[in-house]
């Protein structure tokens, strides 16, 4: 499924019955979030609210509300194909030189895909058809959703934030929520380890008296949005990876007020700066954990320009107790993670992030165990190999006879193969999601690893239990009789 911008993608979704246009007047205050939540929970379509109460601009919600639509957005036909995408990312993360001509030929499809990666800069673009600047800038003209009753203010949720460190050639793309506090001001809530925050810290150290340039794209094409949340190698620009997903180069254009590249087809672009000394108290907001989070000070983004397409579409979402869009994204990207992990740890059979674990807080791993202590090595590998799992609080490791995606299997393994004292690993003072109020200190908490594998010599001195198996001849015979038994 190939497309060039968000509108073309929406047309394709509509043709497949994956998009519904709502013509009734719907309020961005609470009503849109309620409709989107109900729709997502029944795996319903993307929604285009064509008549937002009090606004002229339509609002797009639930775009990535099913794993299938995430896969389509990444240029794949289904979630199974995301495994192949993960293999390509594993190849890009650690490319190995071919061992011979035959292997070189086998790698040609991968290198052909890589040719689509560099972005293409345009001189003019749809995202700058309308330009608003200076005193005319008014963020209250945008139909920014207010998702939960106790949220402090409307919140931009799908803004693609573009930044660049003072000593870096690569520009960073990230998704950070932004609280509306004035007609030209937003609070930029980014965690300290995220790319935008790192760029900002480097800028502050280099230019302590100069404003930090920022651009935010709303309504970019799905490949570019998803590139910003995918575990790509640090050396690979998100625009380049988006080109790979899309099958043709990402088209960008320079921002009007700074040198940052923005998606040429974006619906809306906010341009401006962060004063290195200006912060504001952010929140509380209902978030993906299902709770309202604490308040904290974050940098203030001052918007100097708004550019947009004619008849622009505002792209939004809500977050709440799973399932929500972040949980669905995590479920789909789970398939991308597996080949990347297997590249480093070939013994991994499956890796699963249960959606009810708030996308990433708990992982279940199944392995082909090869030696005593193997499960602990895998735990450490999961926590350290990809930055995405820095905040994973619980890692459960099972043997490959356990289905990682079946809680009945996993609970059976924990209760029959695990001794709490011997098989539980606790690590203190590790990075934890700032939103995790269960941690004793904001941003710092503990992790637990559970070894639910069969124990080898050196791990136990007892005779290990032998699993019960059925006599297959008897099973086959009863299968043949079953319809006659009246049961």
UniProtKB/Swiss-Prot annotation:
Protein keywords: Cell membrane, Decarboxylase, Flavoprotein, FMN, Lyase, Manganese, Membrane, Metal-binding, Ubiquinone biosynthesis
UniProt binding sites for Mn(2+): 172, 238
Database matches in Pfam families: UbiD, UbiD_C, UbiD_N
Active site per database record: 287 (proton donor)
InterPro entries: UbiD (IPR002830), UbiD-like_C (IPR049381), UbiD-like_N (IPR049383), UbiD_bacteria (IPR023677), UbiD_Rift_dom (IPR048304)
GO function term, MF aspect, one: metal ion binding
Cofactor(s) this protein requires: prenylated FMN; Mn(2+)
Disulfide pattern: none
GO cellular component labels: cytosol; plasma membrane
GO BP annotation list: ubiquinone biosynthetic process
Record membrane topology: Peripheral membrane protein
Entry EC number(s): 4.1.1.98
Localization of this protein: Cell membrane
The organism's place on the tree of life at top rank: Bacteria
Ligand binding (prenylated FMN): 175-177, 189-191, 194-195
Family matches, as Gene3D superfamilies: Single helix bin, UbiD C-terminal domain-like
Pathway: Cofactor biosynthesis; ubiquinone biosynthesis
EC main group: lyase
Reaction(s) the record says it catalyses: a 4-hydroxy-3-(all-trans-polyprenyl)benzoate + H(+) = a 2-(all-trans-polyprenyl)phenol + CO2
Keyword Zinc attributed: no
Assembly: Homohexamer.
Recorded family membership: Belongs to the UbiD family.
Protein name stated in the entry: 3-octaprenyl-4-hydroxybenzoate carboxy-lyase
Provenance organism: Haemophilus ducreyi (strain 35000HP / ATCC 700724)
Lineage: Bacteria, Pseudomonadati, Pseudomonadota, Gammaproteobacteria, Pasteurellales
Gene: ubiD
């Amino acid at each position: 499924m190939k497309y060039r911008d968000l509108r073309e993608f929406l047309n394709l979704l509509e043709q497949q019955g994956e998009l519904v246009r709502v013509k009734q007047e719907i309020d961005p205050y609470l009503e849109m979030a309620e409709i989107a939540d109900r729709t997502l929970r029944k795996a319903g379509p993307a929604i285009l609210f064509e008549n937002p109460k009090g606004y002229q601009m339509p609002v797009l919600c639930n775009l990535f509300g099913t794993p299938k639509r995430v896969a389509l957005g990444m240029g794949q036909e289904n979630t199974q194909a995301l495994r192949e995408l993960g293999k390509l990312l594993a190849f890009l993360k650690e490319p190995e030189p071919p061992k011979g001509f035959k292997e070189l030929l086998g790698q040609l499809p991968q290198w052909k895909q890589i040719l689509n990666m560099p972005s293409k800069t345009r001189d003019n673009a749809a995202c700058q058809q309308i330009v608003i600047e200076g005193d005319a800038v008014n963020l209250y003209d945008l139909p920014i959703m207010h998702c939960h009753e106790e949220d402090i203010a409307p919140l931009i949720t799908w803004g693609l934030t573009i930044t660049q460190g003072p000593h870096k050639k690569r520009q960073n793309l990230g998704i950070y929520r932004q609280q509306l506090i004035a007609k030209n001001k937003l609070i930029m809530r980014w965690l300290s380890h995220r790319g935008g925050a790192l760029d900002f810290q480097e800028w502050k150290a280099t230019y302590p008296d100069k404003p930090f340039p920022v651009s935010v794209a709303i309504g970019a094409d799905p490949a570019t949005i998803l590139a910003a949340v995918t575990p790509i190698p640090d050396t690979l620009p998100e625009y380049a990876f988006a080109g790979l997903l899309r099958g043709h180069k990402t088209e960008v254009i320079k921002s009007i007020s700074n040198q940052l590249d923005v998606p040429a087809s974006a619906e809306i672009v906010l341009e401006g700066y962060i004063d290195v000394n200006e912060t504001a108290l952010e929140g509380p907001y209902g978030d993906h954990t299902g709770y309202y989070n604490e308040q904290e000070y974050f940098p203030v983004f001052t918007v100097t320009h708004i550019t947009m397409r004619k008849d622009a579409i505002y792209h939004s979402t809500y977050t709440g107790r799973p399932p929500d869009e972040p949980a669905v994204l995590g479920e789909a990207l789970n398939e991308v993670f597996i080949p990347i992990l297997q590249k480093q740890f070939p013994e991994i059979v499956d890796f699963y992030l249960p959606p009810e674990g708030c996308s990433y807080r708990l992982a279940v791993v199944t392995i082909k165990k090869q030696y005593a202590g193997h499960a602990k090595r895998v735990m450490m590998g999961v926590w350290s190999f990809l930055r995405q799992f820095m905040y994973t609080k619980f890692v459960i490791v099972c043997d490959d006879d356990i289905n990682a995606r079946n809680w009945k299997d996993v609970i059976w393994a924990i209760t029959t193969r695990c001794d709490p004292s011997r098989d539980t690993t606790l690590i203190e003072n590790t990075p934890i999601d700032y939103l995790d109020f269960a941690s004793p200190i904001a941003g710092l908490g503990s992790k637990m690893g559970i070894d639910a594998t069969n124990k080898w010599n050196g791990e136990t001195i007892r005779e290990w239990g032998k699993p019960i198996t059925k006599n297959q001849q008897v099973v086959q015979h009863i299968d043949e009789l079953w319809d006659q038994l009246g049961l």
